[in-house]
């Protein structure tokens, strides 16, 4: 989990940092768990750009991740810890006692040779997956389901974890990484521990080329566009926005306006909204 810097041989190398990937044990993925990934370039079926700033980048193959962890009672041995280009966390290849191989999100502290298991009778040990009803209050967890059996949807990014705060009736109270406090059904599954790659958030990209390798294209400021391209465009030199507040390219209020629907079904499960930045 170390971060490496560089001598300032060029302006872009001055602040650039990279992960040393000390935890990674192999760079050859399991072929049976790879799927071809077709790039959209941000276009829909009609060829129109629906998501800006996407295109190019290094070719990738998708790693099929087991988010359900539904192979109960069968111990699995960690074979490798690997890099996944499709997510910020590292992944672990586990081999079950019956010979089946699966990828899981690797938690901090999981090493090659460790044995993990899923199911209600599992021990409270890093990497084990079990229903929230069987997890003690105060435990650090990740990879959390919102609907039992659907697969993990919450807390999957590098370095994140949630805390189990209480259990009452059919629901458990969780504090999420964003600061949000919400209810989750106690039959939903979660994995013990914190997601791997803790130093991900302090990596400095350093130069535009690394963003291009990731498939992210440049973002042009609206103020340097023409008035027919953006509400901020036009004027002589560095002109002000010309509106009470900043707007999106489509004329909607930007920066600070809440976009969540007022009457969303999940509002009743949220006790406290996420922290303001």
Swiss-Prot record:
Xref: InterPro entries: NA-bd_OB-fold, Rib_uL2_dom2, Ribosomal_uL2, Ribosomal_uL2_bac/org-type, Ribosomal_uL2_C, Ribosomal_uL2_CS, Ribosomal_uL2_dom3, Ribosomal_uL2_RNA-bd_dom
Q: What does this protein do, in the record's words?
A: One of the primary rRNA binding proteins. Required for association of the 30S and 50S subunits to form the 70S ribosome, for tRNA binding and peptide bond formation. It has been suggested to have peptidyltransferase activity; this is somewhat controversial. Makes several contacts with the 16S rRNA in the 70S ribosome.
Q: List the signal peptide residues.
A: none
Q: Which SMART domains match?
A: Ribosomal_L2, Ribosomal_L2_C
Q: Which Gene3D superfamilies does its entry note?
A: 2.30.30.30, Nucleic acid-binding proteins, Ribosomal protein L2, domain 3
* Span list, region Disordered: 222-277
Q: Which GO terms describe its biological process?
A: cytoplasmic translation
**A Pfam short name:** Ribosomal_L2
What is the protein's given name? Large ribosomal subunit protein uL2
Task: Name the UniProt key words of this record, in alphabetical order.
Answer: Ribonucleoprotein, Ribosomal protein, RNA-binding, rRNA-binding
Self-association state and partner proteins as the record states: Part of the 50S ribosomal subunit. Forms a bridge to the 30S subunit in the 70S ribosome.
Report the sequence similarity comment from the record. Belongs to the universal ribosomal protein uL2 family.
PROSITE patterns, A to Z:
RIBOSOMAL_L2
GO molecular function per UniProt: rRNA binding; structural constituent of ribosome; transferase activity
Q: Spell out the GO cellular component terms annotated for this protein, sorted alphabetically and separated by semicolons.
A: large ribosomal subunit
């Amino acid at each position: 989990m170390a971060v490496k810097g560089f001598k300032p041989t060029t302006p872009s190398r001055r602040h650039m940092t990279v992960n040393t990937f000390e935890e990674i044990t192999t760079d050859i993925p399991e072929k049976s768990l790879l799927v071809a990934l077709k790039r959209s370039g941000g276009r829909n079926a009609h060829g129109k750009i629906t998501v800006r700033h996407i295109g190019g980048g290094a070719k990738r193959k998708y790693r099929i991740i087991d988010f359900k962890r539904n192979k109960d009672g069968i111990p699995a041995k960690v074979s490798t810890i690997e890099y996944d280009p499709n997510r910020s966390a590292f992944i672990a290849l586990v081999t079950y006692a019956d010979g089946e191989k699966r990828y899981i999100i690797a938690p901090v502290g999981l090493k090659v040779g460790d044995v993990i298991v899923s199911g209600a009778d599992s021990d409270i040990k890093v990497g084990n997956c079990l229903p929230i009803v069987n997890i003690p209050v105060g435990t650090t967890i990740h990879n959390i389901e919102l609907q039992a059996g659907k697969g993990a949807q919450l807390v999957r990014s590098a370095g994140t974890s949630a805390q189990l705060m209480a259990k009452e009736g059919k629901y458990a109270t969780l504090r999420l990484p964003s600061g949000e406090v919400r209810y989750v059904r106690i039959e939903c599954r979660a994995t013990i521990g914190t997601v791997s790659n803790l130093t991900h958030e302090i990596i400095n990209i350093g130069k535009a080329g690394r963003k291009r390798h990731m498939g992210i294209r440049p973002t042009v400021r609206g103020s340097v566009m023409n008035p027919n391209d953006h509400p901020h465009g036009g004027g002589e030199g560095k002109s002000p926005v010309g509106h009470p507040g900043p707007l999106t390219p489509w004329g909607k209020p930007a920066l600070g306006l809440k976009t969540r629907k007022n009457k969303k079904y999940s509002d009743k499960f949220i006790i406290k909204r996420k922290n303001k930045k």
